[in-house]
Amino acid sequence: MANEKNQQTLGSLKDSLQGIETFYVVDYQGLTAGQLTQLRKDIREKGGQLIVAKNTLLNLALQEGGRDFDDALKGPSALVLAQEDPAGVAKALSDAAGRNDRGIPTVKGGFVEGSKVDVAVVQRLASLGSKTTLQAELVGVLSAHLSNFVGILEAYREKLEGEGGSESA
């Protein structure tokens, strides 16, 4: 591995993995160049990045960060980094797999917010929707409850004012 190009690639991989809490290992074999380009674009739109490199280099870079994915790095593999929206990136992978009859790319495993996860967890993340969608749903739920709470407080205030007014008369 003393080859200069491999050393540069390894350094670049380590730099890319700095501060990354969520990533997925995927099998991309069977995608056409056009499909791979579209996948990269979709992932980039969700704040992620698709990295294709030799498994040995990917594994070395991951192991330096204390993350062992030797079991998932078999056959052609790519690393999908989810910097901003882990669920959105997982959904982009799921959508891309749904657009072709072979279900490619195939998720082999992942690392979500500091924990190694299996394929089922990544699929569950993909079904959640994007971060902004989840935030909008949360705001909607909270505002509905706050509105009800304000109504209750208003009714209680009116009741107290009514009792206070009848006592002074």
Swiss-Prot record:
One of the GO BP terms on file: translation
| Keyword Ribosomal protein attached | yes
Example of a GO MF term: large ribosomal subunit rRNA binding
Cellular component GO terms, alphabetical: cytosolic large ribosomal subunit
Q: One Pfam family, short name please?
A: Ribosomal_L10
The regions listed as transmembrane in this protein's record are none
Its domain of life reads Bacteria
Q: Which SUPFAM superfamilies match?
A: Ribosomal protein L10-like (SSF160369)
Supply the InterPro entries for this chain.
Ribosomal_uL10, Ribosomal_uL10-like_sf, Ribosomal_uL10_bac, Ribosomal_uL10_bac_type, Ribosomal_uL10_CS_bac
The record's keywords, sorted A to Z, are: Ribonucleoprotein, Ribosomal protein
Q: How does it assemble?
A: Part of the 50S ribosomal subunit.
Spell out the family assignment given in the record's similarity comment: Belongs to the universal ribosomal protein uL10 family.
NCBIfam families in the record: PRK00099.1-1
State the name under which the record lists this protein: Large ribosomal subunit protein uL10
